Amino acid sequence: MAAPRLPPARALSGVMVPAPIQDLEALRALTALFKEQRNRETAPRTIFQRVLDILKKSSHAVELACRDPSQVENLASSLQLITECFRCLRNACIECSVNQNSIRNLDAIGVAVDLILLFRELRVEQESLLTAFRCGLQFLGNIASRNEDSQSIVWVHAFPELFLSCLNHPDKKIVAYSSMILFTSLNHERMKELEENLNIAIDVIDAYQKHPESEWPFLIITDLFLKSPELVQAMFPKLNNQERVTLLDLMIAKITSDEPLTKDDIPVFLRHAELIASTFVDQCKTVLKLASEEPPDDEEALATIRLLDVLCEMTVNTELLGYLQVFPGLLERVIDLLRVIHVAGKETTNIFSNCGCVRAEGDISNVAEGFKSHLIRLIGNLCYKNKDNQDKVNELDGIPLILDNCNISDSNPFLTQWVIYAIRNLTEDNSQNQDLIAKMEEQGLADASLLKKVGFEVEKKGEKLILKSTRDTPKP
């Protein structure tokens, strides 16, 4: 590669040009050359040493500005050089492990991290400073890309301070680039270190919440966090309601993805199922606050609803269903909660009444009806081909409760759909439950029109009442 030389000074048209200007021109030429793979592969190590020398020298001005804020105004030329040094090194590392190794062995990673931390310390949002900041992060991302040795050094220098400084930065590009570095550097062992620095993990959740279009926070959560049940269990209690909803939404997205959970995913999601089910059993009654006269906490209700949503999606998976069908207290708590909500909606006018409606977020337009629908859906899932649970619902008087919810919710076809599904699963190969519903109709506790609405009819053969289905089972 015919690289430009970097002498201390030179004359242009008889005028001596200061070294910083000359360096800047040469650096820009190098940056352009390193866009080509052949130039990257033939670059001599001495060039990187010279670039690093310029970077170190220029960083002194930033150090001075950190000690004396009045010097910030004098940073322009130094920031230009720093930016171009980072661009040059960034380009040199693209798909070139030889350059990655050469630059790493010059301790450029430590110099870059120290300088980036100085940028954050300045807390000045000048565009020139932000540009240098971004280019520094891009360099760290490129030198670590597909290079385990570089990833290790980046981790040593960057964790935890750089991530704590950058993941919550107001500039979305800085958030994205620091997320890229975190994603690139994390491995199984380093995930354990993250468990001891949960603020970083929470900052990633917040970053995705603020910048859902950014792929790096999304990938960190879905490809790394959700594969570490230990991290999720440690982090979940420390999340606020909005952060919980964000994490649970991504868990739902993972479960319902076009790509089914793999054999390796199942043990991990069984651990997640334990966390979600136990949290729901312990905290689900917080949704009853919505029936109070005080203004409801929509965020708390939405977090509770998302727990239920996750359980509904988990119980569609055969491996997870078996675990949740026998989870202690889950079915009982769901029936109990459905009963309390149903009674609350009948006794007073509140969000659980037919007319109650609260706008929450996204596709949830009616919190109460959606919550009841999913409670009934979960009961149906938990009773799928499980006679013990079918009988338990009967013992807890859950069948009349489910039918009565359908009776008062003519305006909610979504709820009716899940009542049909639940009754179908409750009566499948269960003559006792079939007889109960048939007798309810005979005694006037369930009229024929209601049973017809949910897809059943009672037929009398001699002295025996037979419950018959009139439609196919809807998909869960």
From Swiss-Prot:
Record PTM text: Polyubiquitinated. Phosphorylation at Ser-13 by AURKB promotes the association of ATXN10 with PLK1. Phosphorylation at Ser-78 and Thr-83 by PLK1 may play a role in the regulation of cytokinesis and may stimulate the proteasome-mediated degradation of ATXN10.
Pfam families on file: Atx10homo_assoc (PF09759)
Localization annotation: Cytoplasm, Perinuclear region; Midbody; Cytoplasm, Cytoskeleton, Cilium basal body; Cytoplasm, Cytoskeleton, Microtubule organizing center, Centrosome, Centriole
InterPro entries per record: ARM-like, ARM-type_fold, Ataxin-10/CTR86_families, Ataxin-10_domain
Sites bearing Phosphoserine, chain numbering: 13, 78, 431
GO BP term, pick one: regulation of cytokinesis
Modified residues (Phosphothreonine): 83
Keywords: Cell cycle, Cell division, Cell projection, Cytoplasm, Cytoskeleton, Methylation, Phosphoprotein, Ubl conjugation
Gene3D superfamilies in UniProt: Leucine-rich Repeat Variant (1.25.10.10)
Omega-N-methylarginine PTM positions: 10
Protein purpose: May play a role in the regulation of cytokinesis. May play a role in signaling by stimulating protein glycosylation. Induces neuritogenesis by activating the Ras-MAP kinase pathway and is necessary for the survival of cerebellar neurons. Does not appear to play a major role in ciliogenesis.
Family in the record: Belongs to the ataxin-10 family.
Identification of the protein by name: Ataxin-10
Originating organism: Pongo abelii (Sumatran orangutan)
